[in-house]
């Protein structure tokens, strides 16, 4: 059963600055009494806020980002996914204690809620907002400073289907049902009760357990895998009880009856066993599927390595198309009724490319009588091959061999039309053109190609640059008209002429911006008129649009005023510069 337990203040707050802002001993005792001997699941921040490991229970931390940080904490169970932790610990009652994100994710899986509600506000900055529609309040318990509410899931509500199937634990009633004075049930349940300390191992009669175990294995129908696994667990229980029963006089402090290391070790092994038992059907299915497949052994790649007689970068002739060759060979094999392999298990001899290549070449020479001016169809070539050899492996190998023979210039392949079959002929050795390049020539040709490519790229970039400057110059001439000057001309101007040019160009820029704004306003107004014609506006819309028009008029007046102000400033600056030049000239005349 999955249970959620947390404490909240009057405003549903659960934490402040990632810490619990209250310290109420009575509420803390209630938490320990409720969760002791049960696994607890928490988020990373909750683990930091606790600042300790709770004893007598499995501490499970859910975190994706802090796996390395907590990896050496052997007393913790680390999970990156809440759902996986719920599945692994689904055989026992567990509690989820926080924080906010973990509680909100887990409530859809919860069977019971235990909420401690405080009577005061503690100024929290972290709150839980949950929907309790799927739960009903079944019990309340009042304390001095808080009230505990117990909620249970309504019978007509369901958990998410994906988790229900995985949490559906079916204990096999036929497998080793035990019966003792204080216990009756399967071995699975016994281990879980001892694991959760719901049953004292010292009160367990291991002799009676062993007798019942041997009585079970004496039956005819048993599962040896399950029997051996549970026998191992029984031996572990026997060892634990022996360690607790026999005192160690050499070191009296060595045996600690409250130590949970052994219990935690058994818990981990049970979880590990459960994982493998769940994976076993899938592994068996994969094993059966693998038996129905056959693998191709590794080829000898030495036959594909280049030798001194091989041509470097030798292309196939223009009239040879591997795709057409493949289609032609498929038609040949269809006629020979060799389409697919239907047997699942067959014994295959390793095919050598060299042997198949020599076989095909010898058949071609035999059919053509070593004549170089005759052609033979592929269909006739493969009719000479032993039918027992014709299968998919031989088809693929022969396809590669034909390409190799063409590359080695031993045969030629020709096809007049796409629908016709491909014909083969022998190549006259005296007419073979040796187009092989030396290594130095290949390297030199590659270097020249790289150099030509760089020069071509550089030339293209320069052309683009000149084209850009030319387009920019034409644009500026069209924009500024008589006030346009080139860079060279601008450097030759006097300061007064430069200022005059700048003032006029700024006026043109501002006028252009103003024209664009007016044009956009006209477009917007036309769009609004069209919208008004197609859709009757409400009174509220009319008032809103009137306010918008008034605001646009105000902005237009302000912009016009700014234009006047800027123009006045520029003219004043121009006047000051002229006065400054006049004063400098008068000073020079006086000095002379």
Swiss-Prot record:
<dbReference type="GO" id="GO:0004146">
    <property type="term" value="F:dihydrofolate reductase activity"/>
</dbReference>
<protein>
    <recommendedName>
        <fullName>Segregation and condensation protein A</fullName>
    </recommendedName>
</protein>
<comment type="subunit">
    <text>Component of a cohesin-like complex composed of ScpA, ScpB and the Smc homodimer, in which ScpA and ScpB bind to the head domain of Smc. The presence of the three proteins is required for the association of the complex with DNA.</text>
</comment>
<dbReference type="Pfam" id="PF00186">
    <property type="entry name" value="DHFR_1"/>
</dbReference>
<feature type="region of interest" description="ScpA">
    <location>
        <begin position="156"/>
        <end position="592"/>
    </location>
</feature>
<keyword id="KW-0159">Chromosome partition</keyword>
<keyword id="KW-0963">Cytoplasm</keyword>
<feature type="domain" description="DHFR">
    <location>
        <begin position="1"/>
        <end position="155"/>
    </location>
</feature>
<keyword id="KW-0131">Cell cycle</keyword>
<dbReference type="InterPro" id="IPR003768">
    <property type="entry name" value="ScpA"/>
</dbReference>
<dbReference type="GO" id="GO:0051301">
    <property type="term" value="P:cell division"/>
</dbReference>
<dbReference type="GO" id="GO:0005737">
    <property type="term" value="C:cytoplasm"/>
</dbReference>
<comment type="similarity">
    <text>Belongs to the ScpA family.</text>
</comment>
<dbReference type="Pfam" id="PF02616">
    <property type="entry name" value="SMC_ScpA"/>
</dbReference>
<dbReference type="GO" id="GO:0046654">
    <property type="term" value="P:tetrahydrofolate biosynthetic process"/>
</dbReference>
<keyword id="KW-0132">Cell division</keyword>
<dbReference type="InterPro" id="IPR024072">
    <property type="entry name" value="DHFR-like_dom_sf"/>
</dbReference>
<dbReference type="InterPro" id="IPR001796">
    <property type="entry name" value="DHFR_dom"/>
</dbReference>
<dbReference type="GO" id="GO:0007059">
    <property type="term" value="P:chromosome segregation"/>
</dbReference>
<comment type="function">
    <text>Participates in chromosomal partition during cell division. May act via the formation of a condensin-like complex containing Smc and ScpB that pull DNA away from mid-cell into both cell halves.</text>
</comment>
């Amino acid at each position: 059963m999955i249970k959620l337990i947390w404490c909240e203040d009057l405003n549903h707050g659960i934490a402040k600055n990632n810490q619990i802002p209250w310290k109420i001993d009575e509420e803390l005792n209630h938490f320990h009494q409720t969760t002791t001997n049960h696994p607890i699941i928490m988020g990373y921040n909750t683990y930091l806020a606790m600042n300790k490991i709770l004893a007598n229970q499995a501490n499970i931390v859910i975190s994706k980002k802090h796996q390395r940080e907590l990896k050496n904490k052997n007393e913790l169970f680390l999970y990156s996914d809440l759902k996986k932790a719920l599945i692994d610990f689904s055989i026992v009652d567990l509690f989820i204690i926080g924080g906010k994100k973990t509680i909100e994710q887990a409530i859809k899986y919860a069977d019971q809620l235990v909420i401690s509600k405080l009577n005061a506000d503690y100024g929290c900055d972290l709150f839980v907002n949950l929907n309790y529609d799927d739960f009903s309040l079944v019990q309340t318990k009042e304390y001095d400073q808080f009230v505990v509410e117990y909620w249970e899931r309504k019978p007509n509500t369901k958990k998410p289907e994906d988790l229900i199937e995985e949490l559906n634990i079916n204990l096999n009633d036929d497998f080793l049902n035990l019966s003792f004075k204080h216990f009756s049930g399967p071995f699975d349940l016994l281990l879980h009760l001892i694991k959760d300390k719901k049953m004292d191992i010292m009160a367990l009669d291991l002799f009676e357990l062993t007798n019942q175990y041997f009585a079970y294995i004496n039956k005819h129908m048993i599962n040896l895998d399950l029997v051996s696994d549970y026998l191992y667990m029984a031996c572990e229980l026997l060892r634990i009880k022996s360690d607790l029963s026999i005192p160690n006089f050499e070191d009296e402090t060595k045996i600690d009856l409250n130590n949970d290391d052994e219990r935690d070790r058994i818990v981990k092994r049970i979880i590990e066993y459960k994982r493998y038992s769940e994976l076993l059907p899938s592994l068996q299915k994969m094993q059966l599927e693998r038996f129905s497949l056959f693998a191709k052994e590794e080829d000898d790649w030495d036959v594909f390595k280049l030798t001194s007689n091989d041509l470097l970068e030798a292309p196939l002739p223009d009239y040879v198309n591997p795709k057409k060759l493949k289609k032609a060979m498929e038609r040949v094999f269809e006629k020979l009724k060799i389409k697919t392999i239907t047997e699942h298990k067959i014994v295959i001899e390793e095919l050598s490319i060299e042997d198949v290549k020599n076989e095909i070449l010898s058949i071609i020479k035999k059919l053509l009588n070593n004549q170089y001016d005759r052609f033979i169809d592929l269909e006739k070539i493969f009719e000479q091959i032993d039918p027992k050899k014709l299968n998919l492996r031989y088809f693929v190998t022969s396809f590669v061999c034909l390409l190799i023979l063409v590359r080695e210039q031993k045969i030629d392949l020709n096809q007049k039309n796409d629908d016709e079959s491909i014909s083969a002929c022998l190549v006259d050795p005296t007419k073979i053109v040796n187009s092989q390049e030396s290594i130095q020539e290949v390297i030199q040709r590659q270097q020249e190609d790289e150099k030509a490519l760089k020069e071509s790229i550089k030339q293209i970039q320069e052309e683009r640059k000149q084209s850009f400057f030319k387009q920019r110059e034409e644009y500026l001439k069209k924009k500024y008209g008589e006030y346009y000057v080139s860079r060279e001309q601008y450097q030759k101007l006097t300061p007064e002429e430069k200022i005059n040019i700048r003032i006029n160009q700024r006026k043109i820029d501002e006028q252009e911006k103003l024209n664009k704004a007016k044009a956009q306003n006209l477009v917007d107004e036309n769009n609004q008129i069209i919208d008004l014609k197609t859709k009757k506006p409400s009174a509220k819309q009319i008032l809103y649009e009137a306010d918008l028009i008034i605001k646009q008029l105000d902005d237009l007046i302000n912009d016009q005023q700014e234009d006047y102000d800027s123009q006045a400033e520029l003219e004043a600056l121009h006047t000051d510069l002229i006065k400054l030049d006049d004063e400098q000239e008068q000073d020079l005349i006086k000095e002379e």
